[in-house]
Amino acid sequence: MSFYAAPIARLIEEFEKLPGIGHKTAQRLAFYVLDMPQEKVDRLANAITEAKQKTKFCSVCGNLTDTDVCPLCSSEKRDSSVICVVEDPRDVVAMEKIREFKGLYHVLHGAISPMQGIGPEDIKIKELLDRIKEGNVKEVIIATNPNIEGEATAMYISKLIKPLGVKTTRIAHGIPVGGDLEYADEVTLAKALEGRREI
C-alpha cells in the first residue's frame, strides 16, 4: 500500500527506474519537483522531451548529436587521419575533457560479449572498417574499456585492421596519477609496466 497519492507514487516509481537512483533518492527528487514552480517543471519536462526527440547519432562517427554530422567530425581543426575507437558516446566526452586528442572518434555502441549475446556484427565495427578503407586514416587508437569485453573487442578490431596497413595502437592502462604502487592490483601494475614509455 502506497502512502502517497497515485501521481506522486508514479513519479517516485519513474525516478527509481533511473540508474543509481534508489527509493529514498527517488522520493527526494519527486518532492523537489513538486516544490518547484510550474515554470521550472515545464522547462525540465521540455528539456527531457527535446533531448530525447532531437538527439541522434552522427552519420560518420556514431556520437550523439543534433545534426547529421556532429561538430567534431565536421570541424576542420580535427586531424582526420587519426581515429580513436570508443565503446560509448560518454567515452567521447571523457576523452574530450582531457583536451589532448585532436583526431576524430568512432563509437562502437558496445563491446563484444558472447555471454550477453553481443557479437562483432552487433556493434559498429563494419562502419569503422568502411571509414578506414576510404584511405585517409593513418592511425587507429583503440580506447575500449580495460575489461574482458573491451580487451576482446580491441584484439578483434586490431586483427581486422592489420591487413589494411594502418597503424593500430591501444591506450595504456596503469597507475593513476597520485596513486601508490602498494594499492594497485596485479593487472593494473602489469599493464602499467607493459605500457611504459621512454623519458
Curated annotation (Swiss-Prot):
The gene is recR. InterPro entries: DNA_Rcmb_RecR (IPR000093), Rcmb_RecR (IPR023627), Rcmb_RecR_Znf (IPR015967), TOPRIM_dom (IPR006171), TOPRIM_RecR (IPR034137). PROSITE patterns: RECR, TOPRIM. It holds the Pfam family RecR_HhH. It comes from Acetivibrio thermocellus (strain ATCC 27405 / DSM 1237 / JCM 9322 / NBRC 103400 / NCIMB 10682 / NRRL B-4536 / VPI 7372). Belongs to the RecR family. A zinc finger (C4-type) spans 58-73. Residues 81-176 form the Toprim domain. May play a role in DNA repair. It seems to be involved in an RecBC-independent recombinational process of DNA repair. It may act with RecF and RecO. This is Recombination protein RecR.
